[in-house]
């Protein structure tokens, strides 16, 4: 559906052919990377149940997938997840910049407390709905520049990950969105 700051693809899987649309997203915060694994396990279980024409949680999955299209974006913030899980090169400019940001917040463990994308922007606070209010709250708390968590950014949808997610939701008619 788009690319991260470091140009890593942000993938979305579609399972089902039905007109009703449901969307799941995971790892919008770097320290919520476990959600990606959980969503991929959910995909695996859906596919197995569909192939076997069996039930999952009391629902016949084949029937469900004829009525519903399930979209799953397992990892919205791949750069942040890579930072948190030690996949970024410690000598890279991106890692050094993240370390520089983190040093301003000694109470947030680095990298384990990192929620933001690689630019130090909290992607969950990047959407237009309520952005001005979130900015007011976070700025009053002293979070006015890139940070490991809670920086709203300089304007809504400034970060490519948030913009990709926003545009993707606009191009579909989701009845339910779970993040």
Could you describe each region identified by the protein language model?
Residues 1-22:
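Soluble metallo-hydrolase cores and metallopeptidase-like ectodomains found primarily
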Residues 19, 33-37, 41-179:
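Active-site/substrate-binding loop(s) of hydrolase catalytic cores
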Residues 24-26, 148:
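Acidic/histidine-rich, surface-exposed loop or edge segments in extracytoplasmic proteins
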